[in-house]
Amino acid sequence: MTAVTTGWDNPDADPTTTILLRHGDTRLSPEHRFSGQCELPLSASGIRQAKAAARRLAAGPPIDVVVSSPLQRAVDTAAIAAAELGLTTVIDDDLRETDFGDWDGFTLAEIQHGWPSDVARWQRDPQQPPPGGESFADTAQRVNQACDRLLRDRSGQTVLVVSHISPIKILLCRALGVPLDTIYRLYLGSACINKIQWHGREFAAVHCVNDTSHLP
């Protein structure tokens, strides 16, 4: 009898669970302004969102470790969650947001007015970087390296990953086995929760996406 390939590296091992939490609001969030690698603290609204997410996570299954992007809005969110969970935060530089270059601080409408040809290419092709910035493909390379390290070093654990819209979308694309340009079709709100269980490096099951039921 021919063996059936399931795609599971080790089906008898405990999965590694990643809970992907997007940071809370900053002062740029209400106007949907691009905020790549600029340093922004959480706004009052963002702090409330982070506290609500932290309470939700603390009421759920145990979490073993909190890993965060180094950018302030993520670190602030992670600190609130870690305090609620009784944990400390580990920083991973590769989980930082995409560098949007010259577009930081602008809305999409402003970018479409100022850089019409650049933004048209950027919205079609994840290999296309913004002027002075980083492509989604380059972001994916480092985010996937962070994911590989996590799956190697935290195998069988439940990990809270606090990051940004682009890295979380990239991890969802990887888990779903879909092309990177699927990121253009995903929506993630502030302080949303997403959950992936990994069986090895490649096979994964996505349990939830953009869960904001904990927010007021």
Which positions does each model-derived feature cover?
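Short basic (Lys/Arg) and small-residue
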Residues: H164
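Active-site-proximal alpha-helix that buttresses catalytic centers in soluble enzyme cores
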Residues: T2-T6, N10-L87, I91
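Acidic, low-complexity terminal tails and accessory targeting/binding regions
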Residues: M1-T17, A53, L87, T98-E110, ...
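Active-site signature of alpha/beta-hydrolase-fold catalytic machinery across serine-
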Residues: I80, I170-R174
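Generic structural signal for well-ordered alpha-helical scaffold segments
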Residues: K51-A58, A140, N144-R152, L172
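Phosphate-handling substructures
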Residues: A83-N144, A205-C208
